Amino acid sequence: MLNFFRSTYLSLFLFLALSTLVITKAQSNDKILFHDSHFHITNYIQEGIELEFYVDSIMGDKVGRSTVFGLPLQQQWSYRVTGEAAPTYYLDTDAPLYYYSFCDAWIAAQYLSLPKEKQERLDPMIIGFNVTDMYAADHIKRVLTTFPGVFTGIGEFSIHKEFVSAKISGDVASLTDPALDRIFDFCAETGLISIIHNDIDNPFPKPNKPNYVKGFQELIKRHPDAIIIWAHLGLGRIIKPIEDMGTLFEEMLADPAYNHLYFDLSWDETAKWLDYNDKSLENTARIIGKYPDRFLFGTDNVAPDKQEKQLYVYHLYDRLWKLVGEEVTYKVCIGNYEKLFNDARKKVRAWEKANVK
């Protein structure tokens, strides 16, 4: 009888202990506000923060998972232009930007130094390629085969970007460049997910002048097997919404030809345009509510030094989260990320297994 009571009490103790662990884990998950679909670990002079600091201090218990990429462009410090004043941003100087490939190896080295549980929270992206170079796809393949098990996608890379595109040394990026087609063909082959920045319009549009919509649409339709995320909805610091933009997005979202295209709500500048007035915010909420599986959230922060900067961007969208409701907010901030990036991880690892010697 004594052994029976001992066994019963032991079973009860173990049950309560395990229940506490489950509750604690659930409570911990409840603290997570979002997965970050758009995050830069380094800036335009390739300075930033270490990945372990990012996971421990910036993500912490508020950000569950995150993409990780630097910036594929290095700002040149030309003594002839700025003298001893070293530029740290592309607007600090008239000197050009140039493509910088070492960023991929740096991120891979940082990632591989992390313990497994921290690696699982990150999705590194390949960005160190020149989008005008027919060899760009070869660079992406070379990075994958050199660092198998690390990367989930490519990007954020830019085609048309206010003030940046014109500063880059060499050829100007174009939506019709065969080099870009080779990149997306390789993404389709491997399962790499891609994040592309392409402004929806010119910085200072003129009446009756074409914007970048048609060229972008044609590019997307040429690559139905590549999963593509359109960064910032095509908006920017001064790239404002075009006329009937809501109608345009609804038409694209309803068209099966764009079923592989997703949209990220990222950057404080994007929040500014979406919450420009009550009407614009309500229209945005209506469209997202109608197509909740096609949107993701990201901060677009660049190497922040404290967690508050991550949460600041998230809370800029608070009025939107309230309008779309908890279920849609969960999909945009967490669910869609997990669906897309988990699938990409699986496909890329399978490709690596079949192709890396």
What are these regions (language model features)?
Residues 39-51, 78-79, 165-172, 270-272, ...:
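Acidic/histidine-rich helix-loop elements
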Residues 84-202:
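Active-site gating/metal-coordination segments in enzymes
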Residues 2-6, 10, 23, 27-37, ...:
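Mid-to-C-terminal alpha-helical segments outside catalytic/metal-binding sites
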Residues 26-109, 115:
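An N-terminally biased module of ancient metal coordination in phosphate/nucleic-acid-related enzymes
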Residues 55-62, 107-121, 140-152, 184-189, ...:
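Acidic (Asp/Glu)-rich catalytic clusters
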